[in-house]
Amino acid sequence: YDLEANQIDVHSVSARKPLFMDESAHDWRLIRLGRRLGWTGVALKTCKTQTGALLGACWAKAHGMTLMVQDLTNPMLAQIPHVLLAAHVGTIAGVETNAMQFYPEASAPEAAVHPGENRMAKTDRPLRVILL
């Protein structure tokens, strides 16, 4: 939602459970606003610009916020900076991505060069990316 237009104080919620900013967290200034409103974490997305994700990660970490990396439809070469960001910023659970699940053939040329990035493993949990 539009965080600037709808400044809802969420401290009462985040006092009970971690609360992650998602779609409105595309700029470090909005992450700052979210933290002021009570959000405790941020879901970074390289599809909103790599620079924005990096600056957001830096600001959030410097202010004690928890990080996730989620881009649900980043296929092909866009997948590479997405997983690299998750590998280096210290997320709570690696990376969330499912472009390979929804349209696996979109990344076939990249999978030939970077096979571990696009291989899915079935577990008793939802599908996850295996990074080799």
Question: Where is each model-derived feature located?
Answer:
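Catalytic core of soluble alpha/beta enzymes
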Residues: 1-73, 77-79
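Flexible C-terminal active-site loop/helix
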Residues: 72-132
